[in-house]
Amino acid sequence: MAKIIGIDLGTTNSVVAVMEGGEPKVIPNEEGGRTTPSVVGFTKTGERLVGQVAKRQAITNPENTIFSIKRFMGRRYNEVNEEMKMVPYKVQQAGDHVAVLAQGKEYSPAEISAYILQKLKKAAEDYLGETVTEAVITVPAYFNDAQRQATKDAGKIAGLDVKRIINEPTAAALAYGLDKKKDETIAVYDFGGGTFDISILEVGEGVIEVKSTNGDTHLGGDNIDQRIVEWLIDEFKKKEGLDLRAKGNEMALQRLRDGAERAKIELSTTMETEINLPFITADASGPKHLVERLTRSKLEEMVRDLVDRSIEPCRQALKDAGIDASKIDEVVLVGGQTRMPRIQQVVKEFFGREPHRGVNPDEVVAIGAAIQGGVLKGEVKDLLLLDVTPLTLSIETLGGVATPMIPRNTTIPTKKTETFSTAADNQNSVEIHVLQGERPMAGQNRTLGKFHLTGLPPAPRGVPQIEVTFDIDANGILNVTAKDNATGKDQKITITSSSGLSKEEVERMAKEADAHAAEDKAKKEEIEARNQLDGMVYQIEKMLKENGDKISPSERGDVENALADSKKALETNDAKQMNAARERLTAASHKLAEAMYKQAAPGAGAPGAGPGPEAAGGAQQAQAEPKKDEGVIDAEYVDVDEKK
């Protein structure tokens, strides 16, 4: 039975896991790493790089290396002003939504994410030895409908049937609570690369119930890196009078980002670090080097407001759950950024207890996703997950008011029906405007979709009975139906286009991704064929130079012709042609190999020993001689006896 893999599609890193023998297991990628950088690079030659190899070339190719794409998933162009300032690649408008530009081609955020998912899918297939088509993918708890839908689209483009979208803190709680027998109330504090989430859950006896969730999708480790980058730029400007923000310094900025991230990581375990970036730029006086010392206390001072920003959502989540911080039994830290001592201290101060450090903050979410995959497959028994919708869902009513249908933190899946009426006499249609958010007015919330219910019979205002139903599935994705009770007419909308991609676009991108996977395979085959043929040409040329006089002129001509054909094949990009040339070269070089073998055979180099029968006779004679000379043998026996 095919497995359902669990994927943590992260802002900075991604992880894939699977249930094996009743236990969740993290699957290493092709390079052997348990985490895969969420980075996609596009080279000048048209090659697409994903993961560590893409991250390594980011400094020399910053404008075509896409990272932190999760921050753009399902977002409108007018929502990403701050995010755009933090990346060196071009982010542009595509309708209402966002696209990134690399090597002159436009990509949607879902497409870029799909390339990361494809790499994880392949790692799982290599590990399991079978095709993988189903996955559970995690998202930040505070992701809205559009962001969730974009994640599902990315899965589809990557060739995955996304069986469930689950919230990251909930996945972490699944991993934490798998073996818990007693009931506990836990808080999952998830500070990742691009988003922050807090969830309050009740865990125990096979039930994991989310009581409330809150967060900030504009707060993450990237923001902390950016603060260090800004500080480095300002310090460098003070000393050298050069502004590294100026156009043309893209490579320098990418080096600063790398240096900032390294320094931040080092300061989690040391009190001081040096950021040393030689030849960061140059002016008329020559090259300039950046060397700065950064202390842990200075970093904490720089990012104090960012860390403190995470506390208000915690306060709100506790309020929504109706419990006090003192009633929390355990605080589970998730996300690489929680390794920062200042964050651990703030969490300890707010919740009044030491945070739990028994889980790997980088891997726990993917492990939880794999467990959920096991639940869906029936591999994990007696485990019930009750998640919630993070944001209030409303419809617009008279006066531009947002009338709530499903309040935030409602357990999902759920269904809610309300009856509305018309606002004017003889109104023959109504517009259903679906909203997501916590603000009282429709215009202050996010539009998920609009549709019309038409063909209403003429009637005074307030008379028609229009039944509106909101239905949220287990993925947190919404269906809305409006029905006129008088005529029985109804109209339905599935909020699926909110990611900015139509069904046709998703299918087209999926086909392109498949084609690209085939291209990648062909490229790999070409490289392997080239390497094998190139190595063989080198060997045969060397053999011919050293032993060419030991074969006949016609045989030598065959080898030389095969070598010439092989060199021509190496100039092509055709793996079949190169493999065929290698086979011809192998066949032609057999005589040369035989000549070398004969030369290397024992006794072949003795004087007078030629390839003819005389040599064979000589060998027989040599073997017979010791038998004639018994004295030699006797003498040996005497010698041995004397030694004894």
Curated annotation (Swiss-Prot):
For this protein, the record's InterPro entries field holds:
ATPase_NBD, Chaperone_DnaK, Heat_shock_70_CS, HSP70_C_sf, HSP70_peptide-bd_sf, Hsp_70_fam
**Composition bias type Acidic residues, residue spans:** 632-644
Keywords recorded for this protein, A-Z: ATP-binding, Chaperone, Nucleotide-binding, Phosphoprotein, Stress response
A GO molecular function term, named singly, is: unfolded protein binding
Segments for region (Disordered): 598-644
Q: Which residues carry this modification: Phosphothreonine?
A: 195
What is its induction behaviour? Answer: By stress conditions e.g. heat shock.
| Comp. bias intervals (Low complexity) | 612-624
One Pfam short name: HSP70
Q: In the UniProt record, does the keyword Cell wall biogenesis/degradation occur?
A: no
Under PANTHER family, the record lists: HEAT SHOCK PROTEIN 70KDA
Q: Which family does it belong to?
A: Belongs to the heat shock protein 70 family.
Q: What does this protein do?
A: Acts as a chaperone.
Q: What is this protein called?
A: Chaperone protein DnaK
Origin species: Koribacter versatilis (strain Ellin345)
